[in-house]
Amino acid sequence: MGEASSFVAVRLMRIIPILAILGATYYIFLTCFASFQATDVPVPEEWRNHDAVVDEVDEITETLTHDPDSRPTPHKLTIAEIEDLENKGEFMGFEDEDEIDVFINLDDDGDWEEDDLKKELGDELEGDFEDEEDEDFGDDDDDDDNDDDVDWSRFAYIQYVTNEDYLCNSVMIFEQLHRLGSKADRLLMYPKEMLEPDAAYSNKRGGQLLIRARDEYNVTLQPIEIQHRDGQDETWADSFTKLLAFNQTQYDRVLSLDSDSMVLQHMDELFQLPPCPVAMPRAYWLYNENPPKRILSSQVMLIQPDDVEFERIVQKMNSIGPNDYDMEIVNSLYLDSALILPHRKYDMLTAEFRNKDHTAYLGSEREKWDSSVALSEAKFVHFSDWPVPKPWINDVETRLANQPDCPEGETSCPDRDIWNGFYTDFTDNKKRVCESVGKTGQKWIHWRRM
């Protein structure tokens, strides 16, 4: 008996510490829980009015379920019931004259398919999708912002002058580029005996025009030796000077423009075309000849100056025939490799407004000629209206005798008005830019082209 009591006492002594620890832990837990304060989370308003919402839903459901005018949905109709409704001219709540919207497919994302929407809603949504696409590609303002990153000193419009008679035309081209806001440099190659490039004064009209071009139109003056080759036509004997543009390696690219022309819009965007030795438009007016002459026009040339290319030019100049000039040289070298510029923008002839057939210019027998559209898209227009002389030659009688025809009984029409406008604008520009040189105290008003 005594041994049993002793055994129980020993067991109790071992259990008591464990019970004490458990009790203390439980006490601490109760104390911490009692002092904890829960965050006051507001109850959503719709939960507070749960009963009202449930009642409203029940009321709507009951109305829909027990509406005596409601019709059963298709899956609840029997075939006989469907046929009966069709015979009565009504189905699914629509009368025969009602306009029923077609079903529109959903794409994988659960959105309405664009083609189905356009087919169903037509022009109403056409503009919306176009607006979204335009937003993806940015707007014109973004292009203007990108221009700010371009080093325009790497590019130049280039003109060449062989004598004083053509100097005025070139200065007029540069004045037009200046007025139109072109950002590229302007380079004028001229006979070195006309003026020192840094001269401050000249008592000759040619020198005064060069100074005006330099000081007012930001033109860089480049004295040169005239490149002359004897041939059957002395008019073009000095035109090889134009090819010196291939040697202006101080620039990455130069845009050569014939001076017997008018610039209607600047062409700075051409300097950003993919790299190529030369880019030129087709001489589209020769495509109507029989047989057609498929050659390139040297009236506009985007050139990548290069020593090797210029060496090829010089070699070709030294081996030409008596009837070969600058146009023949560039075609012999680049006809099959030049990048083609669109002539409708960059090399339009004034004679196009006198033509009856515009297929060669439009490049299509189906497109209709619209002189106003042609004028609005053209950036460079070349004076070429045989037998009408060049615009700096005053021969009004010949010009009026060969002006574009108008419908019978009419003295004015778009073709005639635009064509005559080129010549009158040239005359006005010449007076303002060239004939005013050396005169002081006069204010020359900038004209506006029609």
Swiss-Prot record:
Which stretches of this protein does UniProt put in the Lumenal compartment? Answer: 36-450
Q: What class of enzyme is it?
A: transferase
Which Gene Ontology MF annotations are present? transferase activity
Show the stretches that span the lipid bilayer.
Answer: 15-35
Give the UniProt subcellular location, in the record's own words: Golgi apparatus membrane; Vacuole membrane
Q: From the record, what ranges are coiled-coil? A: none
Q: Where is this motif: DXD?
A: 258-260
Q: Which GO terms describe its cellular component?
A: Golgi membrane; vacuolar membrane
Enzyme Commission number(s) from the entry: 2.4.1.-
Q: Which residues lie on this side of the membrane: Cytoplasmic?
A: 1-14
Keywords annotated in UniProt: Glycoprotein, Golgi apparatus, Membrane, Signal-anchor, Transferase, Transmembrane, Transmembrane helix, Vacuole
Biased composition range(s): Acidic residues: 123-148
Q: Where is this region: Disordered?
A: 122-148
Work out whether the entry's keyword set contains Transferase.
yes
Q: How does it sit in the membrane?
A: Single-pass type II membrane protein
**Which residues bear sugar attachments?**
N218, N247
Function summary: N-acetylglucosaminyltransferase involved in the Golgi-specific modification of N-linked glycans.
Family the entry assigns: Belongs to the GNT1 family.
Designated name of the protein: Glucose N-acetyltransferase 1
